[in-house]
């Protein structure tokens, strides 16, 4: 089934206590860094006794943002609305999140606030956990970090909104909100009130379906379809767009399923209507394409009108006939002046209307953005030219006009924005490739009585339900996560796990949606669909990272907040400085243009300063790089959960490894068994296996597998494990009771009403079990050879010892050496005994070892290393590693590990390969280097270009930068930054053969 855009890491919002508010802030993986202050505000309100449980949160698409100043503008506009508690804006995603009190402010008011700020807004989507929904919205018009901050600020302060994140790179906003307090329309309105375009992309509501309907040819067809929907049981409400054929249906899932709903519509329409479930990515892609197309149309329109201006200004004066026509006086002006005025007016106020609208809304909201600079620069050129014409008509003194500067400036800015939209689209290529892994359709097998297959039909993959039996042809993609029920084949899982070798699949083998069936036909039963599917969760993690803000983004946000006022101030100084210089004779009149004045000469410098300055490049420097890097990481099997984690990893000083399952393969095998009692070997193994059958620890599974093989000479499963449930039902194991797993020690339970202990020395000591010297010597010999000695005591007496070996991963030693070459110090922290730990550490080349450490103690080790400000990474795979993963600055969970470990980590290594630890750190370093280069370019561009535009070098070079050329430079600067980030797509992960060439950075 096609993946959802959401992960399942959100918790319900119940409100009422500070702890609850704190929890919901902590689990919000998409929260940007400035959520903290808002959380404090809410906590303060709780302490004051004010109820915040009724707050609502909306997510809106904001159109019109072009730079960081825009997002700051939208955010400020929303924060100024009474009743808005929190707002956040993502510039690249054109998205805003708002938290507000519906008793004080309505969604329409928030939308109007964004529109009043000069942007268009539209509700995007909503998602439901238990008490909240999460909606995703497109936000059009964002161009820089200021736009993002503005939209985010508005959305976060909306009552009922729990979390809001807006991303510039994808023009998306995500809002988690209480649907009882605020709805999606209110969120869209908030975005539009901020001056951006917003629309709903998708919802995680289980009772909502968006369909594309083919077959609506006229009004009668639409009425027939509406009649069918009205009669269908379970349909609560629907909305049909008769022009686009898009149908949105809200239904009761307890009455009718989504597939039954689609089947019912098609059957009642007697085949006239064909319905297809619309993927949220499809809807989003169409919006992105539409925005780029709209920008292209604007550019072409402006270009078509600018070309005649160029001919009138440059070519025609050299052609006698045309020159005569242009200087022919028609009323108070010459024909050429009339033509230029008319053409430029269309460009200025029709094609360039968007700049005025966005600038006005931003200014009205007390903020500034790139649109303000463009509107100011073009208006100065246009209205000066109009004034010069009117002044000439009245006085007879004709000054030069600069209509062409205004027109060409708008044309070049539109070209730059079009190129920028294309470049930004490239940053999401990795996400698009992940989405395309899911097939559009699936073959559903229908069953008759007794489970006999009676037929098959093709259905939309988005309509697959858990329990469906599906047929997968050779070469086809697996349509959903599930289990093979018939057939055998090899499946290529490289696109999901990064593992290049095809994996054998037989009956009861799990399969992952989006992977490719290589050879034989398979029948599978779907188990996980929608947001539960592996591919969906991968996409959700990538999307989460792309929506988040890296801490380094704070710099761009600060600069964006002061950028435009500083530029306007510099432009005024330029105008005044050159004007005064001319008045006092500081420069010769020969510098002036023909028929020009000192004011005109100064004005051109001032306009160039205004239009050459570019806040967009700064706003795009970080989010575009983060977006590309997270996508590249996903394609290489490294899932990064956020910009914060991506940034922290570049300065990792220590990497802490767990031993079992991390440095080792996690495929423990029993190599030695020695009985120190009157029991025979079979009795002993049955006793130990019975005790360990209830444990999920790798060592326990190894013991059970060994005992089974001893009794039945059976082969274990492919991964060295056996099915404990089957073992318990097989009859050869003894009944147990009072089972307890003791982390860091072992297990204990009752067998035949007698206590059995299986574990290490600590467990024996705590239970007063004496270990004779000859047994201790035997255990020490095992440990010194790198094996784990498991001691067994029964009914108060030691009865035997088992030696278990867990082979090291083949790449472990090389990865450790690679980390040392990178300037990173590896440390092994394990709950195993010191002798085994030292033996394993020596084999892989780790000098710093911490053994016999309890799970909570691992977190203490990390905190001790963090005391001097060092950045610590933790690599683990088990539940007992989750406290350490959470305590580390950068937690890395092995993908084959437990869900708890993956949940606590910042990175997920899908391949279960330690080589990806180096990839994660190396990718982080490359990304931060690229971000710094982007900032250097963006800052250097403004630092160098503004003085040039102001004429600082004019006395030496005698070259004045025309306003249109300044506008072209400005437009191309942001495109250059995006293209710089796109270079990260060429990233190649370090290979085992080259990893040792990595040097310290």
Curated annotation (Swiss-Prot):
CDD domains: HMA, P-type_ATPase_Cu-like. The active site is at 658 (4-aspartylphosphate intermediate). Cu(+) 1 binds at residues 67, 70. It is an enzyme of class 7 (translocase). GO terms for molecular function: ATP binding; ATP hydrolysis activity; copper ion binding; P-type monovalent copper transporter activity. The chain crosses the membrane at residues 299-320, 339-358, 366-386, 404-424, 559-581, 603-620, 932-951, 964-982. Residues 1-298, 359-365, 425-558, 621-931, 983-1001 are cytoplasmic. Cu(+) 2 binds at residues 144, 147. It is a multi-pass membrane protein. One of its GO terms (cellular component) is Golgi apparatus. Keywords: ATP-binding, Copper, Copper transport, Ethylene signaling pathway, Ion transport, Magnesium, Membrane, Metal-binding, Nucleotide-binding, Repeat, Translocase, Transmembrane, Transmembrane helix, Transport. Involved in copper import into the cell. Essential for ethylene signaling, which requires copper. Acts by delivering copper to create functional hormone receptors. This is Copper-transporting ATPase RAN1. It comes from Arabidopsis thaliana.
């Amino acid at each position: 089934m096609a993946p959802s855009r959401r992960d399942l890491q959100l918790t319900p919002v119940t409100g009422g206590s500070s702890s609850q508010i704190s929890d919901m802030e902590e689990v919000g993986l998409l929260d940007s860094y400035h959520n903290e202050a808002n959380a404090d505000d809410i906590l303060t309100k709780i302490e004051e006794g004010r109820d915040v449980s009724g707050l609502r949160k909306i997510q809106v698409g904001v159109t019109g943002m072009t730079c960081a100043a825009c997002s700051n503008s939208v955010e400020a506009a929303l924060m100024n609305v009474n009743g808005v508690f929190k707002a956040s804006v993502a510039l690249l995603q054109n998205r805003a999140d708002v938290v507000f009190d519906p008793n004080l402010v309505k969604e329409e008011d928030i939308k109007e606030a964004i529109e009043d700020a000069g942007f268009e807004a539209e509700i995007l989507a909503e998602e439901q956990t238990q008490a909240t929904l999460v909606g995703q919205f497109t936000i059009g018009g964002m161009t820089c970090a200021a736009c993002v901050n503005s939209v985010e600020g508005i959305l976060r302060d909306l009552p009922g909104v729990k979390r809001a994140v807006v991303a510039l790179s994808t023009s998306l906003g995500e809002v988690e909100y209480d649907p009882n307090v605020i709805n999606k329309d209110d969120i869209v309105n908030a975005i539009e009130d901020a001056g951006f375009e917003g629309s709903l992309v998708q919802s995680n509501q289980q009772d909502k379906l968006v369909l594309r309907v083919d077959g609506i040819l006229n009004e009668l067809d639409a009425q027939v379809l509406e009649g069918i929907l009205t009669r269908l049981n379970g349909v609560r409400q629907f909305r049909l767009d008769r022009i686009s054929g898009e149908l949105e249906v809200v239904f009761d899932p307890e009455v009718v399923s989504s597939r039954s709903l689609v089947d019912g519509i098609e059957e009642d329409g007697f085949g006239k209507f064909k319905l297809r479930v619309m993927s949220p990515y499809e809807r989003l892609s169409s919006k992105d394409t539409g925005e780029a197309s709209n920008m292209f149309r604007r550019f072409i329109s402006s270009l078509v009108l600018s070309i005649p201006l160029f001919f009138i200004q440059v070519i025609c004066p050299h052609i006698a006939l045309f020159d005569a026509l242009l200087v022919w006086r028609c009323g108070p002006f010459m024909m050429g002046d009339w033509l230029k005025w008319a053409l430029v007016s269309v460009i200025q106020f029709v094609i360039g209307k968007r700049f005025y609208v966005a600038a006005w809304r931003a200014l009205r909201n007390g903020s500034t953005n790139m649109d303000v600079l463009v509107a100011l620069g073009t208006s100065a050129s246009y209205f000066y030219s109009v004034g010069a014409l009117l002044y000439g008509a009245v006085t007879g003194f004709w000054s030069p006009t600069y209509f062409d500067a205004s027109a060409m400036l708008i044309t070049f800015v539109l070209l730059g924005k079009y190129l920028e939209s294309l470049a930004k689209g490239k940053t999401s290529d990795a996400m698009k490739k992940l989405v395309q892994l899911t097939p559009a359709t699936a073959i559903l097998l229908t069953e008759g009585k007794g489970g006999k297959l009676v037929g098959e039909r093709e259905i939309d993959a988005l309509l697959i339900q858990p329990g469906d039996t599906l047929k997968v042809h050779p070469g086809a993609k697996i349509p959903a996560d599930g289990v093979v029920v018939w057939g055998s084949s090899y499946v290529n899982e490289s696109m999901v796990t990064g593992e290049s070798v095809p994996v054998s699949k037989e009956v009861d083998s799990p399969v992952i949606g989006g992977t490719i069936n290589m050879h034989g036909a398979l029948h599978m039963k779907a188990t996980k669909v929608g947001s539960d599917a592996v591919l969906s969760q991968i996409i959700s993690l990538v999307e989460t990272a792309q929506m988040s803000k890296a801490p380094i983004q704070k710099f761009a946000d600060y600069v964006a907040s002061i950028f435009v006022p500083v530029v306007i101030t510099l432009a005024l100084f330029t105008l005044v400085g050159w004007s005064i210089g001319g008045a006092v004779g500081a420069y010769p009149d020969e510098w002036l243009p023909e028929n020009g004045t000192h004011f005109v000469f100064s004005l051109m410098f001032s306009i160039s300063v205004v239009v050459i300055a570019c806040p967009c490049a700064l706003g795009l420097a970080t989010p575009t790089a983060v977006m590309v890097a997270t996508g590249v990481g996903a394609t290489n099997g490294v899932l990064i959960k956020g910009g914060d984690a991506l940034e922290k990893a570049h300065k990792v000083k220590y990497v802490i490894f767990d031993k079992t399952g991390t440095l080792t393969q996690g495929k423990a095998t029993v190599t030695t068994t020695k009985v120190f009692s009157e029991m025979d070997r079979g009795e002993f193994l049955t006793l130990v296996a019975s005790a360990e059958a209830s444990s999920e620890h790798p060592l326990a599974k190894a013991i059970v597998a060994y005992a089974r093989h001893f009794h039945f000479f059976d082969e274990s499963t492919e991964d060295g494990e056996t099915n404990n449930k089957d073992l318990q039902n097989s009859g050869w194991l003894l009944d147990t009771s009072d089972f307890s797993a003791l982390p860091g020690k072992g297990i204990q339970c009752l067998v035949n009403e007698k206590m059995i202990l299986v574990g290490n020395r600590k467990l024996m000591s705590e239970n007063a079990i004496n270990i004779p010297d000859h047994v201790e010597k035997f255990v020490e010999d095992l440990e010194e050879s790198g094996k784990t000695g498991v001691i067994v005591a029964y009914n108060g007496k030691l009865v035997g010892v088992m030696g278990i070996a867990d082979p090291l991963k083949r790449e472990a030693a090389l990865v450790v050496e690679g980390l040392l070459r990178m300037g990173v110090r590896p440390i092994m922290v394990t709950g195993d005994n010191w002798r085994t730990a030292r033996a394993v550490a020596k084999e892989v080349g780790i000098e710093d070892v911490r053994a016999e450490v309890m799970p909570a103690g691992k977190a203490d080790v990390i905190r001790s290393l963090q005391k001097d400000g060092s950045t610590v990474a933790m690599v683990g795979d088990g539940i007992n590693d989750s406290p350490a993963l959470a305590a580390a600055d950068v937690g890395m969970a092995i993908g084959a590990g437990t869900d708890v470990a993956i949940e606590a980590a910042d990175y997920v290594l899908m391949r279960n390969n330690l080589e990806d630890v180096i990839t994660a750190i190396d990718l982080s370093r490359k990304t931060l280097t690229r971000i710094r280069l982007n900032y250097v370019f963006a800052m250097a561009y403004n630092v160098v270009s503004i003085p040039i535009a102001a004429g600082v070098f004019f006395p030496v070079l005698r070259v004045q930068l025309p306003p249109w050329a300044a506008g072209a430079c400005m437009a191309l600067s942001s495109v250059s930054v995006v293209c710089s980030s796109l270079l990260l797509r060429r990233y190649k992960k370090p290979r085992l053969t080259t990893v040792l060439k990595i040097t310290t950075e």
